[in-house]
């Protein structure tokens, strides 16, 4: 048996409906998953949605909806996209699902047990538009 391959798309932000960029990355991941399957590899292909963040909160507020109801609605568009494109994904995960929260909690606990989590110091600004943390040297170099 050959080694297992893991393929994932980005987990897409649900601040708006899918667009051609989402389709592009999804199809690219699907092509890779199918290619590896044709080569005899066991493949696990994951896609899904990231339902946290300031952009998502703002989009829900702008739509006049409860954040969970908003993410339920928009996430369904992404799930539908997998069928529309005929993707061969094995799973679709949402970051608001209990199984995702449980996995994150277990990972955190394991890292804490190994002393891999520590308090540090960070100074900078967060640009919600680009999901980027910026430091003063970065800003000054632009």
Feature map (PLM): residue ranges:
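N-terminal catalytic cores of NTP/NDP-binding nucleotidyl/phosphoryl-transfer enzymes
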Residues: 2-74, 91-109
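Short, flexible, mixed-charge glycine/proline-rich loop motifs
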Residues: 116-123
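Basic phosphate/pyrophosphate-binding loop/patch that engages nucleotide-derived ligands
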Residues: 112
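Residue-level detector of anion-binding/catalytic polar loops
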Residues: 42, 88, 117
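A glycine-rich helix N-cap at a beta->alpha junction
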Residues: 78-88
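Conserved small/polar residues in nucleotide/adenosyl-binding loops
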Residues: 132-138
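Short cysteine-rich clusters marking metal-coordination/redox-active sites
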Residues: 127
């Amino acid at each position: 048996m050959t080694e297992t391959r893991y393929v994932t798309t980005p987990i897409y932000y649900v601040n708006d409906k899918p667009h051609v960029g989402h389709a592009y990355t999804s199809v690219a991941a699907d092509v890779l998953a199918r290619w590896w399957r044709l080569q005899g590899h066991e493949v696990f292909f994951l896609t899904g949605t990231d339902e946290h963040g300031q952009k998502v909160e703002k989009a829900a507020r702008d739509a006049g909806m409860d954040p969970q109801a908003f993410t339920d609605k928009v996430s369904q568009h992404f799930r539908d996209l997998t069928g529309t494109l005929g993707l061969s994904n094995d799973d679709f995960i949402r970051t608001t699902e209990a199984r995702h929260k449980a996995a994150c909690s277990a990972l955190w606990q394991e890292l804490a047990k190994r002393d891999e989590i520590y308090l540090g110091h960070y100074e900078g600004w967060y640009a919600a538009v680009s999901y980027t943390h910026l430091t003063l040297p970065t800003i000054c170099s632009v």
